[in-house]
């Protein structure tokens, strides 16, 4: 079964919830990443020279980009059944930064935890699954572009 209209709607509505507190949700997202994989701090230029996760325009922009790409992936999965990267350099950027498979797992866990918090009472297993499938589609496309 392909990605459904309902799954896309769940991703879109929770994306809007995420954006309502972009600063707080961005900090939460990167805090979870660094709790799970402290060495990943060096992968993010905007975190390299900081003591911890500090709010900044670059941090917010990157979080918004990651979550936005997952939202866009949901739309592609529904309409095309696969994710095609709009930015051909994403694979090369991830290779250059030294991103490996375990990093994708950590980011996925952080993304799902952040969406759960951002969604509040609207969170459900169905919403979680929609984000998980959309993220997996994006991660697969990025990994393919990394080879």
UniProtKB/Swiss-Prot annotation:
Listed GO biological process terms: nodulation; response to abscisic acid
GO function terms (MF aspect): heme binding; metal ion binding; oxygen binding; oxygen carrier activity
Binding positions for O2 per the UniProt entry: 62
Ranges where the Globin domain occurs: 2-147
Source taxon at top rank: Eukaryota
PROSITE patterns: GLOBIN (PS01033), PLANT_GLOBIN (PS00208)
Entry keyword set: Cytoplasm, Heme, Iron, Metal-binding, Nitration, Nitrogen fixation, Nodulation, Nucleus, Oxygen transport, Phosphoprotein, Transport
Modification note: Nitrated in effective nodules and particularly in hypoxic conditions; this mechanism may play a protective role in the symbiosis by buffering toxic peroxynitrite NO(2)(-). Nitration level decrease during nodule senescence. Phosphorylation at Ser-45 disrupts the molecular environment of its porphyrin ring oxygen binding pocket, thus leading to a reduced oxygen consumption and to the delivery of oxygen O(2) to symbiosomes.
Modification type Phosphoserine: residues: 45
Modified residues (Nitrated tyrosine): 30, 135
Main location group: cytoplasm
Induction (UniProt): Strongly reduced levels in boron-deficient nodules. Inhibited by abscisic acid (ABA) in parallel with lower nitrogen fixation in nodules.
Binding site for heme b: 45, 94, 97
InterPro entries found in the cross-reference section: Globin (IPR000971), Globin-like_sf (IPR009050), Globin/Proto (IPR012292), Leghaemoglobin-like (IPR001032), Leghaemoglobin_Fe_BS (IPR019824)
GO cellular component terms given for this protein: cytosol; nucleus
UniProt note on tissues of expression: Root nodules.
Localization annotation: Cytoplasm, Cytosol; Nucleus
Record-stated family: Belongs to the plant globin family.
Record's subunit section: Monomer.
Role description: Leghemoglobin that reversibly binds oxygen O(2) through a pentacoordinated heme iron. In root nodules, facilitates the diffusion of oxygen to the bacteroids while preventing the bacterial nitrogenase from being inactivated by buffering dioxygen, nitric oxide and carbon monoxide, and promoting the formation of reactive oxygen species (ROS, e.g. H(2)O(2)). This role is essential for symbiotic nitrogen fixation (SNF).
Protein name as annotated: Leghemoglobin Lb5-10
Organism: Pisum sativum (Garden pea)
């Amino acid at each position: 079964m392909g990605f459904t209209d309902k799954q896309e709607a769940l991703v879109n509505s929770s994306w809007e919830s995420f954006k309502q507190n972009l600063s707080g949700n961005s900090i939460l997202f990167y805090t979870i990443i660094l709790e799970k994989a402290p060495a990943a701090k060096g992968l993010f230029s905007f975190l390299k020279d900081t003591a911890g996760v500090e709010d900044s325009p670059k941090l917010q922009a990157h979080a918004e980009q990651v979550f936005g790409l997952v939202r866009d992936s949901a739309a592609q999965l529904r309409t095309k059944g696969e994710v095609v990267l709009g930015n051909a350099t994403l694979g090369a950027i991830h290779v250059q930064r030294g991103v490996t498979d375990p990093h994708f797992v950590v980011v996925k866990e952080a993304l799902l935890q952040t969406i759960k918090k951002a969604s509040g009472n609207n969170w459900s297993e169905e919403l979680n699954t929609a984000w998980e499938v959309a993220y997996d589609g994006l991660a697969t496309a990025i990994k393919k572009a990394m080879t």
